[in-house]
Curated annotation (Swiss-Prot):
Annotated protein name in UniProt: 6-phosphofructo-2-kinase/fructose-2,6-bisphosphatase
Gene Ontology biological process terms, A to Z: fructose 2,6-bisphosphate metabolic process; fructose metabolic process
Superkingdom, taxonomy of origin: Eukaryota
Binding positions (ATP): 36-44, 163-168, 346-349, 390-394, 426
GO molecular function, a single term: ATP binding
Organism of derivation: Caenorhabditis elegans
Leader sequence segment: none
Gene of this entry: pfkb-1.2
């Protein structure tokens, strides 16, 4: 069957972005440089920012100078990066080693960006002196790379102590070499060594310098000379993240009439099995007693019915952005119908499922774009339950699981299952609850959802 004129897919008529996240009209590789004393959350910010940029389509990589330093240590000097004296400004030999580690990281970063492999590089190190930052700026100018600084400033002892206790004492510098108490004492001495030479970012350093200061884990910010799309996205993201204890629950709606018939999209109501799941979901959260839980629901009938038995004080909001991927002219069809009527469309979708756009409909790439405000709100909020659809939840899970975009359309999300995500400093815990409709019992596993066996769904 021929596609009606004007409905051919899949490329937009505006400038298309390549696999590195750049428009075909302009390509400016970006270097994001972290600044700050140890235990200020620089690596946490680097990893979260890298995940976000990759999810939005920018090929991004973190270059952590500490890892280069540790790789430079030989077997006879395994502790050479751990002892606080190594970070003393008076330790000339150590300064040479640290400078060489930074140089190697910068060279690898430039190779990554200039080879066309990457679009954004994050240079994760303390970079606490003006001299060190000037070296980076001059290097980036020579390589024609756009440079943006992120300084994490913190004078809250509780935040610093939490970061040192929860993260640093278990870092590769200390693990297996010292007790937790020894590691903490040594790391606090390391911080004191850095303080002796710390020069905070300031516009007087260079009026043209582009930077953002993140103060006390996001309580306030200072932004200066932001340039370009990437830097604007970075600022937008940093102003929305936090690391307070919380959980994010994700579930598809219960089985709908279209699900039972194998049809795409539509707005059909729940089947009897779907209604059972809706009741069981309400019972689950009645028992869990999640404090301050908010419910975000798609505007489709099947999603609203799934959330209808939840307690009124959960405060349910209905988001158009959470609606299922629009299958366009294929809405209401089965996959067999599509193969028979639109074989070329079926083949195009199988070839590149992430970028494929249904005629008069959407692609997964489009869904990611409309979900960005949802992700930002999820980063800002406390406990949230999201009731939505398979394609939408694949996009959300790919973000929190840090899955590549090529895997995103294949994350297997069964009906009548609930995913609990608990964000941590450097990863996200995932627990899956599956409901047995006959017994009404939930089974629990701690794991990420796998990829689908079938490339069709």
């Amino acid at each position: 069957m021929e596609i009606p004129p004007g409905l051919e897919t899949t490329k937009r008529k505006v400038a298309h972005s390549d696999e590195h996240g750049f428009s075909d009209q302009v390509r400016v590789p970006n270097v994001i440089v972290m600044v700050g004393l140890p235990a200020r959350g620089k690596t946490y910010i680097s990893k979260k920012l890298c995940r976000y940029l990759k999810w939005t389509g920018f090929t991004t990589k973190v270059f952590n100078v500490g890892e280069y330093r540790r790789s430079d240590a030989n077997a006879a000097d395994a502790i050479h990066g751990a002892n606080a004296s190594f970070f003393s400004p008076n330790n000339a030999d150590a300064l040479k080693v640290r400078a060489e580690s930074a140089r190697r990281a910068m060279e690898d970063m430039a190779d990554y960006l200039n080879s066309g492999t990457g679009g954004v590089a994050i240079f994760d190190a303390t970079n606490t002196t003006k001299d060190r930052r000037r070296i980076i700026i001059d290097f980036c100018k020579k390589q024609r790379l756009r440079c943006f600084f992120i300084e994490s400033v913190c004078d809250d002892p509780a935040i610093i102590d939490c970061n040192v206790t929860d993260v640093k004492v278990n870092s590769p510098d200390y693990k297996g070499l010292m007790t937790a108490e020894q590691a903490k004492e040594d790391f606090m001495n390391r911080i004191e060594n850095y303080k002796k030479q710390y020069e905070p970012l300031d516009e007087s350093e260079d009026e043209s310098l582009s930077f953002i200061k993140v103060i006390n884990a996001g309580r306030s910010f200072k932004v200066h000379q932001v340039r370009g799309h990437v830097q604007s996205r970075v600022v937008y993201f940093l102003m929305n993240i936090h690391l307070l204890p919380r959980s994010i629950y994700l579930t598809r709606h219960g089985q709908s009439e279209y699900n039972a018939m194998g049809r795409l999209g539509g707005d059909s109501p729940l089947t009897e099995d779907g209604q059972k799941y809706a009741s069981a979901l309400a019972d689950f959260f009645e028992e869990e007693e999640v404090p301050g839980l908010r419910v975000w629901c798609s505007q489709k009938v099947r999603a609203a019915q799934t959330a209808q038995h939840l307690k009124p004080d959960f405060h349910t909001e209905y988001w158009k952005a959470l609606d299922e991927l629009d299958a366009g002219i294929c809405e209401g069809l089965t996959y067999e119908d599509i193969l028979q009527r639109y074989p070329k469309q079926a083949d195009d979708r199988a070839t590149d499922k992430y970028h494929y756009r249904y005629p008069s409909g959407e692609s997964y790439e489009d869904v990611v774009s409309r979900l960005e405000p949802v992700i930002m709100e999820l980063e800002r909020q406390a406990n949230v339950l999201v009731v939505s659809h398979q394609a939408v939840l694949r996009c959300v899970l790919a973000y929190f699981y840090d899955r590549p975009l090529s895997e995103l359309p294949y994350i297997d999300i069964p009906l009548h299952s609930l995913v609990k995500l608990t964000p941590r400093a450097y990863h996200c815990d995932s627990t899956i609850y599956a409901l047995d409709l006959e017994s009404g019992e939930w089974t629990e596993t701690s794991d990420q959802l796998p990829l689908c066996d079938s490339p069709r769904d």
